[in-house]
């Protein structure tokens, strides 16, 4: 604790963000890291708690509290305050393989459980983390770590998202020969095609993939298991296989008019936009274009917000985002106490941009889409909705009830369905013969072994839709279990 009175004297700061209207003109990152001095000030606010709840990584009432990868947050906060940046980087990398990702797109459950947040704004942990790793790359402190010895064991990893990359990194450092298979044309999975460039610039992902390649990991893209290579071939060629395919099966909205032209899954929209941007700066026209259209995003989460931001950059005529839940309160309520994840109203980057563009927040709350209507050519022209009320039933459980008389018709030529994911796609599960429940691969947490010998599973493919930090956590842990399976014991943390 470098400055015992820091939390009393220094206010929380946000990193600089580009003007919303200016950033709508391009696809570059909307935010910037802290300056060195700002990071030191914010590090001084850390109280070095005896029990640092910021790093507990616990599940409280179904939500994540604290960091799931157990980042040594008070330690590197203090080192940053003291200007010992390289040591701060070393402490950060002990637990987090990819701080350049989490420092940008993680929802920061660490801050929600920060002890200071009981009475004051939390320490700016996420932005300090980003500044540490960015400074590490800028100063050349991060160089390829090529293993000095190889074990002679080979591991195949299916999927190159955060769980796959974390397990690959760990196993490679343990001396195993690792090959990562990715069905897309670029490695990175969700990091590459699931998150827009203005939120996570793809050069940052490519830099990490290049580093992992230099360290000895092989990436095989444009390769789908069951099409280009069979599961049996993988099991024959490798000593162990890890399934890290993510939860790619998108949840559908099966209502009247769903088959209208202009209704798309959110991830299809985001993926095509990013791919076209990377391939040709949109010159190939191989994307879903919202220009001049009334756009409605169904689903109130982060993926929906990314659709809003993408549509704004494409110069949509109007954008609305529908969510079934009521608007969150401005501060914690008595049934949402610290250190639970705070369920409070926030204004994310996409909503700031919509307010700047249209003068209003695009979110509509407690609303249910009842049907979609197409014109005589089958093209979507409008959505019908009704307001909902969230109430407790006689059993004490919440349920949603329609409010008669609140029906409304919305003009719409594009709709993006962003209501979550159901789990792993079935063809892959059948290829390997692994057991599953509700499209999630059956493999116990902490063990990660499926019912098929030598086949493991981790990340969203196992646990369902979750956070990037949980994917990294499971990638690291499954690597340890695979190392133990191959060698009898493990050198990995």
Curated annotation (Swiss-Prot):
Biological processes, Gene Ontology terms? L-glutamate biosynthetic process
State whether keyword Aminoacyl-tRNA synthetase applies. Answer: no
Pathway field: Amino-acid biosynthesis; L-glutamate biosynthesis via GLT pathway; L-glutamate from 2-oxoglutarate and L-glutamine (NADP(+) route): step 1/1; Energy metabolism; nitrogen metabolism
Q: Which region is the signal sequence?
A: none
Q: Which InterPro entries match?
A: DPD_II (IPR028261), FAD/NAD-bd_sf (IPR036188), FAD/NAD-binding_dom (IPR023753), Glut_synth_ssu1 (IPR006005), Glutamate_Synthase (IPR051394), Helical_ferredxn (IPR009051)
Q: Which EC class, in a word?
A: oxidoreductase
What is the recorded name of this protein? Glutamate synthase [NADPH] small chain
Enumerate the Gene3D superfamilies for this protein: Alpha-helical ferredoxin, FAD/NAD(P)-binding domain
Tell what triggers its expression: The gltAB operon is positively regulated by GltC and negatively regulated by TnrA under nitrogen-limited conditions.
Recorded hits in PANTHER family, A to Z, give: GLUTAMATE SYNTHASE [NADPH] SMALL CHAIN
User: What does the record give as EC number?
Assistant: 1.4.1.13
Q: Which UniProt keywords apply?
A: Amino-acid biosynthesis, Glutamate biosynthesis, NADP, Oxidoreductase
The gene behind this protein is: gltB
Superkingdom, according to UniProt?
Answer: Bacteria
User: From the UniProt record, which GO molecular function terms apply?
Assistant: glutamate synthase (NADPH) activity; iron-sulfur cluster binding; oxidoreductase activity, acting on the CH-NH2 group of donors, NAD or NADP as acceptor
Family, according to the entry, reads as follows: Belongs to the glutamate synthase family.
Stored Pfam families: Fer4_20, Pyr_redox_2
NCBIfam families named among the record's database cross-references: GOGAT_sm_gam
Q: Write out the catalysed reaction.
A: 2 L-glutamate + NADP(+) = L-glutamine + 2-oxoglutarate + NADPH + H(+)
Quote the record's binding site residues for NADP(+). Answer: 299-313
Annotated coiled-coil positions are none
> How the protein assembles, per its UniProt entry?
Aggregate of 4 catalytic active heterodimers, consisting of a large and a small subunit.
């Amino acid at each position: 604790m470098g400055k015992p009175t820091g939390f009393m004297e220094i206010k929380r700061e946000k990193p600089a963000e580009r003007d919303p209207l200016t950033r709508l003109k391009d696809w570059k990152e909307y935010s910037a890291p802290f300056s060195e001095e700002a990071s030191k000030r914010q590090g001084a606010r850390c109280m070095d708690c005896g029990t640092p709840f910021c790093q507990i990584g616990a599940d409280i009432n179904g939500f994540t509290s604290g960091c799931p990868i157990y980042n040594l947050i008070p330690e590197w906060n203090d080192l940053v305050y003291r200007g010992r940046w390289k040591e701060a980087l070393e402490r950060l990398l002990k637990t987090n393989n990819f701080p350049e990702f989490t420092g940008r797109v993680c929802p920061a459950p660490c801050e929600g459980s920060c002890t200071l947040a009981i009475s004051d704004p939390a320490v700016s942990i996420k932005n300090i983390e980003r500044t540490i790793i960015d400074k590490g790359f800028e100063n050349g402190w991060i160089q390829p770590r090529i293993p000095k010895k190889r074990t002679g064991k080979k591991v195949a990893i299916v999927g190159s998202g955060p769980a796959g990359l974390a397990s690959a990194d760990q196993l490679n450092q343990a001396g195993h020969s690792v090959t990562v298979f990715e069905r897309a044309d670029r490695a990175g999975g969700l990091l590459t095609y699931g998150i827009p460039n203005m939120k996570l610039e793809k050069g940052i992902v490519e830099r990490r993939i290049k580093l992992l390649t230099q360290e000895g990991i092989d990436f095989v893209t444009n390769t789908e298991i069951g099409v280009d290579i069979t599961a049996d071939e993988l099991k024959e060629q490798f000593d162990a296989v890890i399934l890290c395919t993510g939860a790619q099966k998108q949840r559908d909205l099966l209502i009247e008019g769903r088959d209208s032209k202009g209704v798309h899954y959110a991830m299809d929209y985001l993926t095509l936009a990013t791919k076209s941007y990377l391939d040709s700066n949109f010159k190939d026209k191989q994307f879903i274009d919202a220009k001049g259209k009334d756009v409605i995003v169904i689903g109130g989460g982060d993926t929906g917000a990314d659709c809003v931001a993408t549509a704004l950059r494409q110069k949509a005529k109007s954008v609305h985002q529908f969510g079934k839940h009521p608007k969150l309160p401005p501060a914690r309520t008595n049934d949402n106490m610290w250190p639970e994840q705070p369920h409070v109203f926030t204004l994310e980057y996409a909503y700031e941009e919509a307010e700047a563009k249209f003068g209003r927040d695009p979110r509509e709350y407690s609303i249910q889409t009842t049907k979609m209507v197409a014109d005589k050519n089958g093209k979507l022209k409008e959505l019908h909705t009704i307001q909902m009320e969230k109430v407790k039933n006689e059993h004490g459980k919440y349920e949603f009830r329609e409010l008669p008389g609140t029906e409304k018709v919305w003009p719409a030529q594009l709709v993006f369905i962003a209501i979550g994911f159901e789990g792993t796609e079935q063809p892959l599960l059948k290829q390997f013969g692994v057991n599953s429940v509700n499209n999630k691969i059956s493999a116990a947490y902490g063990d990660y072994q499926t019912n098929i010998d030598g086949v493991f599973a981790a990340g969203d493919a196992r646990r369902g839709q979750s956070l990037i930090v949980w994917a990294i956590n499971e990638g690291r842990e499954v690597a340890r279990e695979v190392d133990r399976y191959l060698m009898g014991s493990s050198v990995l943390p």
